[in-house]
Amino acid sequence: VIGHEPVGVIEELGEGVTGYKIGDRVLVGAITPCGQCRACLSGQWAQCGHGEGVEAVGGWRFGNTINGAQAEYLLVPNAQANLAKIPNELSDEQVVLLADIASTGFSGAESANIRIGDTVVVFAQGPIGLCATAGAKLMGASFIIGVESDPVRMEMAKRIGADVVIDPKQAHVVEEVKRLTDGGADVAIEALGIQETFENCLRCLRPGGTLSSLGVYSGKLQVPYDAFAAGIGDYKIVTTLCPGGKERMRRLMAIVQSKRFDPTPLLTHKFSLDQIVEAYDLFGSRRDGVLKVAIRP
């Protein structure tokens, strides 16, 4: 069973789970760390070692190593570390995207250590890239450039935080970014996962800049020596995966509750569980301005 962005109501509590009751409405992150291993205690929840050590991407369990959320019921592992109560003021729709895409996108901005006044370029304005754009704005970037060719996503990028959106089909992206930033961005966030955008991110940076990589790459990834100043340009490349755990979810809900971030425009379509094939057909074809779909049992 797939699905890793769950909001639900507690139907049953396992032994040792305290501070919750039947009927509580909760958000659970896409990453479900144990909270006790070396990775978790170091703040690297996505690399959870399930009690000890470190395991690459070990925190991603829903729909990967255990059954996921697109069902009537969901068993949450290490529930004490992963159940985040939803404030009464927030709807399911306001919080469901925090479980994965918002946490991931924001992490791209956080991992880059964006500073107040930085210039930032975000390649690809899909759901995660849009959240990276919003995260860059929250962290104090003074000028944010989105790179996207889809008209619906270009408009959403401007709505959510981009000052300028470059269409790569209409302009030379690297040249335009360098022109707009007086020589190169402080931070480039890669949210697509292909060689071309990774390389363009590097070429858009000023010397000493940071490339924050959110994309999941399926083939060989190369670092061109000229874009990397032969390794001596003080460039930084950082990678990240969606942080999880109840404290991460609490913090994200606090941002929504304070009205500093509204994820609901990204949730463009809703379906019942028995319409799931229709939902995936729409999502896969990117018709009708779809960004994210919600499935209710």
Kindly give the residue locations of the regions a language model identified:
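Short glycine-/small-residue-rich Rossmann-like dinucleotide-binding loops
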Residues: 14, 31, 170, 192-193, ...
